Curated annotation (Swiss-Prot):
Family according to the record: Belongs to the ATG3 family.
Handle region, as annotated region: 251-334
Active site: 247
MF terms in GO: Atg8-family ligase activity
Top-rank taxon: Eukaryota
Annotated Acidic residues bias: 142-161
Protein name per the record: Autophagy-related protein 3
Alphabetical list of InterPro entries matching this protein: Atg3/Atg10 (IPR007135)
Record's comment describing the protein's domains: The N-terminal region is involved in phosphatidylethanolamine-binding and is required for atg8-PE conjugation. The flexible region (FR) is required for atg7-binding.
Amino acid sequence: MNILHSTLSTWRDRLAPVSRTSTFRTTGQITPEEFVLAGDYLVYKFPSWSWADASSPAKRVSYLPPGKQFLVTRGVPCHRRLNENFAGDAGHEDEIVRDMLAGDDGDGWLRTGGGRDLAEGHADRTGDVRTVDEAGNIGEREEGDDEEEEEIPDMEDEDDDEEAIIREPAGTSSTTQPIRTYNLYITYSNFYRTPRLYLSGYLSPSEPLPPHLMMEDIVGDYKDKTVTLEDFPWFDGGVKMATVHPCRHASVMKTLLDRADAALKIRRDKLKQAHSPAEASRISAERGLEGLVDETRGLSLGEQQQQGGGGSGGDEWEVLQHDEEDQVAIRVDQYLVVFLKFIASVTPGIEHDFTMGV
């Protein structure tokens, strides 16, 4: 079934009419020219990514230039397997990113991360709370007052205590072993007019990971639905890879673009209401694109200022300070960076940010 689907998908992309009209802001889709522009930006900002050509001229697509048929980064580490507990939490408590339009529960993208465990952990941390008055005096516990406070043992007393050593029970398998690496490929889907991600895993530099084992690194709700095993269309010989189907990419990207623009508008409004240069400076230094991604550490997505350099936002998203009403939070050349941030929810064990290290 996957072979038939892969063949149909390849021919559908090659035979679909090529769009030359930009609808980036209104649909979340991009043209082949915009894909090349976004790819050039990704390669420039993050040299671990590079352009690559098809394995033979017959495998090239006509709407992309030779030598820029797809993007690739190699040796991305994957330190953990996604067990059934992780997948179960993803199915129960995770948030679905919607495009704000009417539709069924499938019209969106699942934001993963073990929401139930995080919520329970948060409840555990907040259940035993003490208050502190203005003088710095610590009050009694809000809950559990009748429980005696445990004595904190001296670590030096535990150095030779065999019972204090935590050992992993025999026969149990850790979700952090063995370490795998992945080659990631970003292609352009001409039918859906969005990027598409392919993954090829390795147990060692010389030992490819069998395709069915790649599914161990995919969130359970996506296996055989959003993620399937298909031949990579740009290689001869039928190289099987895991691929994230692009049918929802445009709507999710549109949602993220809208959120980023809304966050930029909020920041502009705050700057207008600032009462002092110091307050304006503090607002400008705040993290941009609120609600787009939960973490952006390690990324440097904004171009450096041409004059004057510096600024605390150098490792964050660039938000220009001049107050232009038509200014957007994310340019089309930054498209693939945002794409990689949301696609990471499918494979949270793979360190996508590793490919963006500066």
